[in-house]
Curated annotation (Swiss-Prot):
Lineage: Bacteria, Pseudomonadati, Pseudomonadota, Gammaproteobacteria, Alteromonadales
Protein name (database record): Ribonuclease HII
Gene name of the encoded protein: rnhB
Catalysed conversion reaction: Endonucleolytic cleavage to 5'-phosphomonoester
Source superkingdom: Bacteria
Source organism of the structure: Shewanella pealeana (strain ATCC 700345 / ANG-SQ1)
Recorded GO MF terms: manganese ion binding; RNA binding; RNA-DNA hybrid ribonuclease activity
Function (record text): Endonuclease that specifically degrades the RNA of RNA-DNA hybrids.
């Protein structure tokens, strides 16, 4: 595994060869729900305009690109780790597990895997961790969009089950509204019990 910071266009050209997969995660910081990862192999002959780090795109734009990625990519796979797995393994190791699941779910074995961030798990093929890769490499951008839309939809579904928590707004992140809901309504089965605010709410 190589960690690449400040990647140059020349380096991008060197590593973006063959049927490589981009991988990213969403949901390391929230107090509830799965950490969600995605792996995407794009089709160089069927480009998608407007790919970028999902955090820099509007919800409407993410949803539009989500559909285009599903239609145009060679392969798309989502992998998750549950709150129970997060509590057992810790969030870092659970995220690595979710990434392995996403790559294993691809219907094409990638020639290499490019991950946003500063570390990768063992995928059984060459891998590179690329800092800020979600804004630099289209396949990672696509993975960030898929993971973000999938996780947001999971939070919207949770909001229908527990409307008093406001998950459709804060998506489970540690906001003032979420802390107030925890204090008033208590901890849900889907909360991550190893995260301090949840642990304190249980005390």
């Amino acid at each position: 595994m190589a960690v690449i910071k400040g990647i140059t266009p020349e380096q991008i050209a060197q590593i973006c060869v063959g049927q490589y997969a981009g991988v990213d995660e969403v949901g390391r910081g929230p107090l509830i729900g799965n950490v969600v990862t995605a792996a995407v192999i794009l089709d160089p002959n069927n480009p998608i305009e407007g790919l970028n780090d999902s955090k820099k795109l509007s919800e409407k734009k993410r949803e539009l690109l989500f559909e285009q990625i599903q239609q145009k990519a060679l392969s798309v796979s989502v992998g998750s780790a549950t709150p129970a797995e997060i509590d057992e393994l810790n969030i870092l190791h659970a995220t690595m597990l979710a990434m392995q699941r996403a790559v294993a779910g691809l219907n094409i074995k990638p020639s290499s895997v490019l991950v946003d961030g500063n570390r990768t798990p063992d995928f059984g093929v060459e891998s590179h961790a690329i800092i800020k890769g979600d804004g630099l490499i289209d396949a990672i951008s696509a993975a960030s969009i898929i993971a973000k839309v999938v996780r947001d939809r999971e939070m919207d579904a949770l909001a229908l089950l527990y409307p008093e928590y406001g998950f459709e707004k804060h998506k489970g992140y540690p906001t003032k509204a979420h802390f107030e809901a925890l204090a008033q309504h208590g901890v849900l089965p889907e909360h991550r019990k190893s995260f301090r605010p949840v642990r304190e709410a249980l005390a």
